[in-house]
Amino acid sequence: MAANPPNCSTWSASIAYTAGAVVVDQGKTYTANWWTQGNEPVTNNGGAGSGQPWTLSSGCSTTPPPPPTPTPPPPTPVPPPPTPTPPPPAGSVTYGPYKDITVSMNWNTNVISTAVTGTLSPVLSVKPAKLKMVTWAFATGACGSETWGGLAPAAVASANVQNFVNAGTKYIISTGGAAGSFTCASDANFETFVNRYASSSLAGIDFDIEAGQSAADIDNLVKRVKASQSKHPGLRWSFTLATLGGNAAQSLGGAGVTTMNAIKSNGLTNYIINLMAMDYGSAIASNCTLNSSGKCDMGRSAIASAQSLHNYWGVPYSRIEITPMIGGNDATDETFSIADVTTLSNWVKANGVSGIHFWSLDRDKDCAPGYASATCNSYGTAGTWGFTNAFISALGL
C-alpha cells in the first residue's frame, strides 16, 4: 500500500478531528467540516448544506504537482461552515417567548394567564396580535406522568390546547428548567407525553437542561427524540442550554457539552440548539462581550454565544436559536435593552438563525432597574409588551 502524502494521515475512529483537518480514507482525501469523531469519511461526506461532517476534497494528493507550479491546484471552492447561510425570508424566524404557566395562572380554570396588562387575563386575550407563538414552561418529572408546577398534565392540556388552536396561535411544550428536571426512559411513555399536547398548533418540544440531569438522562432524551421524529415529522425539537457569551472557543456549560456529545453519538441530525444568552456572571471577557463601560454588552454577547456554538461544534446557524432574558438579568449589572433587541434581531436575520425566544412573557412590563423580577422587566422604559413588540418589529413579523 502506498504511503499517504505529506500532511494527510489515515482516518482513525479514535481521533477527534476539528474543522479543516485532512485525512485519507480508503484511498480518498476528505476535509473535516467541523468537530467530528467516529464518523467515517467514506460513508459520512457531502457538500455544503448536507449536514455531513466530511467533504471529499483534493486538499492533498498522491500525484506530485506538475512543474513549475509548486503546489497542487486548489480544490473546488466549498463554503466552510462559518460562512453564513442565506437569510430566511421575512417572517420565517421562529419567535415565541417563554411563559412560566405557574406565574399568574388562573388556578380555578387552569387557563394560561398573565397580569402584564395590570389585570389577570388569559394570555390569548391580551397578547399582541402579531405574537403567533408562546412557549409553555415547564413540564417536569417523568414523561407520561409529568407535572406542571403541581398541575396534572391532562388539566393543562384540556384547558389550553383547543384555545390555542381556536386562536390560531402556535405553542411549544418546554420541559425541565432551572427548578426541575425532565426524564424519559421509554419510547412508549414519550409518545404518551407528546400526544397529550398534540394539535395543529403544536410547534415543537423543548428540553431545557439545567437541573442536573445525568449523562444517562440526557442520552435518553436524545434517543427518545430520534425515535419519535418519524411519527411527528412536522415538529421542531430543541435542546435549551446555558452558555457564556465571551471570547472562549467553547462556551457551553457541562450539561451542554454532555448534550452535544449525546446528539453526535446518537446520530441525531434533526435538532435545534437554543442558547440561554443570559446571566453570564462576572463581567470579564471570557464570560461575556464587554462594552466601553466594562459591562456585558448583552446583544453582542448573545451573538458571540451563537458564533461559538457554530464554530466549535459545527452547528449550522439554521439549527441555532437564542433566548435572552429581557431587561435586568440575575446579575444586576447585566441588562438586555431595547437596543439589544435590534442588534440581535438584525444579526439573526442576516445569518439565517432559526429563531429567537425570550425569558419571559410575564416580565414584559416596566418596573425600576434592580434585582430581576418574575413579573416585570427591571428595566423601566420599554412599556407594556415593549420587548414583545420590539422583537416583532425588528424581525419583520
Q: Where do the model's predicted regions map?
A:
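N-terminal carbohydrate-binding/catalytic regions of secreted carbohydrate-active enzymes
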Residues: 89-199, 222, 341-355, 361-394
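Substrate-binding cleft of extracellular glycoside hydrolase catalytic domains
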Residues: 145-269
